[in-house]
Amino acid sequence: MALDENKRKAIDLAIKQIDKAFGKGALVRLGEKPVEKIDSISTGSLGLDIALGIGGIPQGRIIEIYGPESSGKTTLALQVIAECQKKGGICAFIDAEHALDVSYAKRLGVDAENLLVSQPDYGEQALEILETLTRSGAVDLIVVDSVAALTPKSEIDGDMGDQHVGLQARLMSQALRKVTGVLHKMNTTVIFINQIRMKIGMMGYGSPETTTGGNALKFYASVRIDVRRIASLKQGEQHIGNRVKAKVVKNKVAPPFREAEFDIMFGEGISQEGELIDYGVKLDIVDKSGSWLSYGDKKLGQGKENAKAFLKENKEIANEIQAKIIGAIGSSDEITTFGDDEDESENLES
């Protein structure tokens, strides 16, 4: 639609004034700025990467991972750190809970020697560290574990029984307002791990669950992932891991409400080989005959655990299966934007 000449001149003048005040590019016409592919960081789970729609979590955005205790939230965040480090990224872990298990992180593939770690004394300190790291432009990924542990200093200094209504929510709201724009400019991703609480006096319809820290994080997060443990995995009588469901309840860069299920093995993290078998069977890439699993003319093993062990030792076959799975589901790297189930048995026989 052609603009009136006077309006066009007025708009051009306004753009020049804005560029002079705030820097070139502060206001542009949509047609003048190229459409860019969203960069992503893999979660370490093939299924969750596919569910997220762009091959992982988006860079330069705020991500929230929440769920009940022992559901795999921190494990998932550590897997993202490991994947980011593999690409040469610099990562930081703000351990507000003072509970980071370094030996476990190493087993998940985290380069602990080069991981920046802070154990802040109170919430304001944690969020100031977050802001400083973000503004440096040198850090690719920051994990905050957890929102519930970001206790305001006034609450720590106060007496037991003192009322501090809404302090944490205001703290989070202020911090998110300050860092959101900087994150995008610096292409820094922040993952907030959060816990679930029950709503007090909840009656009638709606979920009785809510996350801590107020509503600000819900609004500022580009992606929110709900992580739940749905089954305990056994080998004979021994518990060897958990079956986890991750639901993308909010997604600003791809369609939301997609789900993924994967195994988290004790001491190992997300079982990537297990996902290859699960998706391979569903897509008829891996054949299942009784308890035997095979790929083409190659026997993978009897039972899922033996097949997983085979794929661990034969990376070429695992990569081939993964490529076929991605090809069958469709490329997850095609989302662009403007701007810089089957139930599984709880008992796994080997």
Swiss-Prot record:
A molecular function (GO) term: single-stranded DNA binding
Keywords: ATP-binding, Cytoplasm, DNA damage, DNA recombination, DNA repair, DNA-binding, Nucleotide-binding, SOS response
Claim: ATP-binding is one of the keywords in the record: yes
Cross-referenced CDD domains: RecA
GO cellular component, one term: cytosol
Keyword field contains tRNA processing: no
GO biological process, one term: SOS response
Principal subcellular localization: cytoplasm
Protein family per UniProt: Belongs to the RecA family.
Function field: Can catalyze the hydrolysis of ATP in the presence of single-stranded DNA, the ATP-dependent uptake of single-stranded DNA by duplex DNA, and the ATP-dependent hybridization of homologous single-stranded DNAs. It interacts with LexA causing its activation and leading to its autocatalytic cleavage.
NCBIfam families the UniProt entry points to: tigrfam_recA
HAMAP family: RecA (MF_00268)
Protein name: Protein RecA
Organism in which the protein naturally occurs: Wolinella succinogenes (strain ATCC 29543 / DSM 1740 / CCUG 13145 / JCM 31913 / LMG 7466 / NCTC 11488 / FDC 602W) (Vibrio succinogenes)
Lineage, opening ranks: Bacteria, Pseudomonadati, Campylobacterota, Epsilonproteobacteria, Campylobacterales
UniProt gene name: recA
